[in-house]
Amino acid sequence: MKKALIIVVLALMATVTAHAAGDIVGKWKTIDDGTGEVKSIVEITKKGGKLYGTIVQLFNEDPNYDPLCTECKDHLKGKKIKGMQIIDGLTLDDGQWVGDDGILDPDNGKYYDVKIWVDKEDDSKLNVRGYIGFLYRTQTWIREK
């Protein structure tokens, strides 16, 4: 009986640890830089040790809002933005998820080198830093509850 109880406690501890602060997997609200309003929700998943992100919801006053990626130059041109994978195959490097051309901005159709990490002081915030050469811009996404 004690052995079974210990196994259950250890299993619960492992589950809690997997969902502890710093876990990047889940849904994140993206914030419009200009308005400060929530723009979309991106669901981040891990598969085969790599990180992926898909737009699962868009916010707009128009209930029929369902835009296409008109600025994309590749196989995503003309595809719906909702359901689009915008984070592709990032790898973990020293506590940050990184990738060359790892994130797509569907507003302009451009790919950027990227680093993504959960904020150390507030695990409800995700720092998403896009790079062009040495120049970068960091957005803060908010964990969906």
Where are these regions (language model features)?
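Bacterial N-terminal signal peptides
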Residues: 7-15
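Sec/Tat signal peptide C-region and signal peptidase I cleavage site
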Residues: 16-21
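K/E-rich alpha-helical interaction surfaces of small helical-bundle regulatory domains
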Residues: 22-39, 138-145
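Central antiparallel beta-sheet cores of small beta-barrel/beta-sandwich binding domains
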Residues: 32, 37-105, 111-113
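Short, exposed beta-strand-loop hairpins at the edges of beta-sheets
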Residues: 106-107, 117, 121, 125-138
